[in-house]
Swiss-Prot record:
The RecF protein is involved in DNA metabolism; it is required for DNA replication and normal SOS inducibility. RecF binds preferentially to single-stranded, linear DNA. It also seems to bind ATP. The gene is recF. It comes from Serratia proteamaculans (strain 568). Its main location: cytoplasm. GO terms for molecular function: ATP binding; single-stranded DNA binding. This is DNA replication and repair protein RecF.
Length: 361
């Protein structure tokens, strides 16, 4: 999968842009605040229905405009696919695929699997469990056809159960929610556990190349005691949940812990090493998807040079080239991305929201 064309209208500081994209590397070079990250964010939004720097649609729509519009053409395995997304200041979204409306954002995500690497991405390693659950859920979404529906139903049931906890006095009054919740929770936990086991070898191999000085280990924690039956646990902890007014255990509390030499990575690794580990996780996940399904991710890398010395930048560049995937990279100067340049690459100069193709030597 690769985007061959990207049209942007009234997104961030970009009034209008029509970009013919390279199947390999697409470099976005410009000063801070020029709009290069906005291009990355437009690509991300086209595949996710939301931006990665803001969850509010109004903040990514250009000043005084009613909506943003994004359109892309995807070079699929068998044919070219047209996709589009628009969103108004009121939050109304419209998803279009091959000229027809009424589609879901999840369909865009299936068509455009992406891995995002940003300076804020350290939260995958030093943030709360929700960021690592999202890592596992990305893999389950792209590998298990029933995952998204089950995950959506789980969120709905947990919300309903938590609301009911504020109103009920006996467990029998909440049993109906649990009878639906329990099989969903167990199924999602099984999918996550299977995915974490399956991808462990890929992560270990990639980390050995990026951080050979550490012995890294990975463990999936499902969100409740592994020796306990989830249904019995919910009933046993009813009074505690009622006092808290939320469900304290379950797949919504799962985690994927990473240790280096037996120590949590966030307590041992430098920022440069954490960035390499984050890149290793994203690369391993993308390569696992390719091996399982034949589909390639798009890799979006914002501020490529931050936290990485020349040797580490070259290592990351070589691994990205080996994926043969489409890559979008932002940098302050062209010199920072010279190790990535090649015959399948294209360089764009971004200044004050204007984007121009730059010739490569």
């Amino acid at each position: 999968m690769a985007l061959t064309r990207l049209l942007i209208k009234d997104f961030r500081n970009i009034e209008a842009a029509d970009l013919a994209l390279a199947p390999g590397f697409n470099f976005l070079v410009g000063a801070n605040g020029s709009g290069k990250t906005s291009v990355l964010e437009a690509v991300y939004t086209l595949g996710h229905g939301r931006a990665f720097r803001s969850l509010q649609a109004g903040r990514v729509i250009r000043h005084d405009q009613p909506e943003f519009i994004l359109h892309g053409r995807i070079d699929g395995a068998e044919r070219e696919i047209s996709v589009g997304l628009s969103k108004s200041r009121q939050g109304d979204s419209k998803v279009r695929i091959d000229g027809s409306d009424g589609h879901k954002v999840a369909e865009l995500a299936q068509l455009l699997p992406m891995q995002l690497i940003t300076p804020e991405g350290f939260t995958l390693l030093n943030g709360g469990p929700k960021f690592r659950r999202a890592f596992l859920d990305w893999g389950c979404f792209h590998n298990e056809p029933g995952f998204f529906t089950a995950w959506s139903n789980l969120k709905r049931l947990l919300k309903q159960r938590n609301a009911a906890l504020r109103q009920v006095s006996r467990y029998a009054q909440i049993r109906a929610w649990d009878q639906e919740l329990i099989p969903l929770a167990e199924r999602i936990s099984e999918w996550r556990a299977a995915y974490s086991d399956a991808i462990a070898a890929d992560i270990t191999a990639t980390c050995a190349q990026f951080l050979p000085e550490f012995a890294l280990s990975f463990s999936f924690q499902r969100g409740w005691d592994k020796e306990s039956d989830y249904g019995e646990l919910l009933e046993r902890q009813f009074e505690r949940d009622r006092a808290l007014t939320y469900t304290a255990v379950g797949p919504h509390k799962a985690d994927f812990r990473i240790r280096a030499d037996g120590t949590p990575v966030e307590d041992l690794l430098s920022r440069g090493q954490l960035k390499l580990l984050m890149c290793a996780l994203r690369l391993a996940q993308g390569e696992f998807l390719t091996r399982q399904s034949g589909r390639r991710c798009l890799y979006l890398i914002d501020d490529f040079a931050s936290e990485l010395d020349t040797g580490r930048r070259r290592l990351l560049a070589d691994r990205l080239k080996a994926t043969q995937a489409q890559v979008f990279v932002s940098a302050v100067s062209a010199e920072q991305v010279t190790d990535m340049a090649g015959e399948k690459g294209k360089m764009f100069r971004v200044e004050q929201g204007k984007i121009e193709v730059q010739p490569q030597d």
